[in-house]
């Protein structure tokens, strides 16, 4: 199994997205309208490591705010 995170609001990302223009340019691609939090990624990892996922195999756990589901290839 694999944990596939989307953009997570960390100090490093916050430093890069230091203007409203830069931040909004990224947010427009996230259907949930916000960046992920580290705790949300941790919860996914804990699920994969738990007995709750004991019958889950060969899967990608997408925690990306809907980016993958909404992605369209530019023409």
Describe each model-derived feature in a short phrase.
Residues 1-9, 49-52, 62-64:
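Conserved SDR Rossmann-fold cofactor-binding beta-strand/turn motif
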Residues 5-15, 69:
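Short, flexible catalytic-loop segment of classical short-chain dehydrogenase/reductase
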Residues 15-30:
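A short C-terminal helix-loop "cap" of Rossmann-like NAD(P)-dependent dehydrogenase/epimerase domains
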Residues 30-41, 52:
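A conserved structural motif in NAD(P)-dependent oxidoreductases
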Residues 56-58:
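Short, small/polar-rich loop/turn modules that mediate ligand/substrate recognition or access, typified
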Residues 73-75:
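A short alpha/beta connector and helix-capping loop motif
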